[in-house]
A protein has these predicted regions:
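Short, flexible helix-loop junctions that flank or precede catalytic/ligand sites
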Residues: 1-201
Length: 201
């Protein structure tokens, strides 16, 4: 997984692979302009949530349904309406944010850091206010998201799930039975919202 940006052509998210002994790849176009909140028709309440000091926002939906676009739009809104340090950890970086009122630090797994856990382990040492985790795939990553919220940071993340109910089931099932009681307490105190997206044909 990586991103490329040939001059004069555009920016693309790429997945390269081998099939039948040959190289194959899939490219998805990434718009270079970060869409405005109003252009996407996002619920107005999300403006309040993205301006929160702390908590967790989860975006869920199938691959290609616009989770990254919505998060980029919300970060763009925060970038223009507050004065904080935003850190994103992505695989790969999709939307490139310019510094507006905020300082935006973007780290790509495999390029700027060896792995998710290495990047997440050191994130709090970089004095963030808002942290974007490109994707929650395992318990350790979810642990970091909860820890970030508990220490006074706003954390945005994506998760592959078809609905908000399924997203919560997946999060709960990341953890062993003996930890679930504490997990539910942590989520009740820190989860600001689960936003489920589906593209309309």
């Amino acid at each position: 997984n990586f991103a490329i940006a040939p001059p004069g052509v555009g920016r693309f998210r790429v997945n390269a692979f081998v099939q039948q002994g040959r190289i194959g790849m899939v490219l998805r176009t990434i718009t270079t302009d970060i869409p405005k909140f109003e252009e996407l028709g996002l619920p107005p309440v999300l403006k309040d949530v993205i301006m929160s000091k702390r908590g967790i926002m989860m975006f869920v939906g199938a691959t290609g349904c616009g989770k990254s676009t919505s998060m980029a739009s919300l970060l763009g809104y925060r970038n223009e309406n507050s004065y904080v340090h935003i850190i994103t950890i992505e695989d790969p970086i999709e939307f490139v944010h310019q510094h507006r009122n905020c300082i935006v630090t973007q780290r790509e797994v495999g390029v700027d850091t060896d792995g998710w856990n290495v990047a997440l382990k050191n994130t709090l040492r970089q004095a963030p206010d808002v942290i974007l985790i490109g994707e929650v795939r395992e318990r350790e990553t979810m642990d970091y998201a909860i820890s970030f919220a508990e220490t006074g940071h706003l954390c945005l993340a994506t998760l592959h799930a078809n609905s908000t109910n399924q997203a919560l089931d997946r999060i709960i099932n990341f953890f062993p039975e003996e930890r679930r009681s504490q997990l539910l307490m942590d989520l009740s105190l820190n989860l600001k919202g689960v936003i489920s997206q589906r593209l309309i044909p």
